[in-house]
Amino acid sequence: MAKGQSLQDPFLNALRRERVPVSIYLVNGIKLQGQVESFDQFVILLKNTVSQMVYKHAISTVVPARPFNVSAHQGTAHGEESDAE
């Protein structure tokens, strides 16, 4: 795992696993809302009434709608489930 990914992956994975609603602000100011369905190195799949593939380089900020625990889910990454935690 690259050093820059060490916080990003557990953060996004916890949002995905707990189905936390998020607001994603793009660098051009547009606000997207939904739940993180999946993600990889370059994109986040955001689900609301439709699924949108959002490129990470276009994202400014990810704002969770409610508190959640990142540290409880640090065993997995990239939107994949893990039974061994």
From Swiss-Prot:
Any Gene Ontology biological process: regulation of RNA stability
Classification via SUPFAM superfamilies: Sm-like ribonucleoproteins
CDD domains: Hfq
Keyword annotations of the record: RNA-binding, Stress response
Role, per record: RNA chaperone that binds small regulatory RNA (sRNAs) and mRNAs to facilitate mRNA translational regulation in response to envelope stress, environmental stress and changes in metabolite concentrations. Also binds with high specificity to tRNAs.
Self-association state and partner proteins as the record states: Homohexamer.
Name of protein: RNA-binding protein Hfq
Species name: Shewanella frigidimarina (strain NCIMB 400)
Gene that encodes the chain: hfq
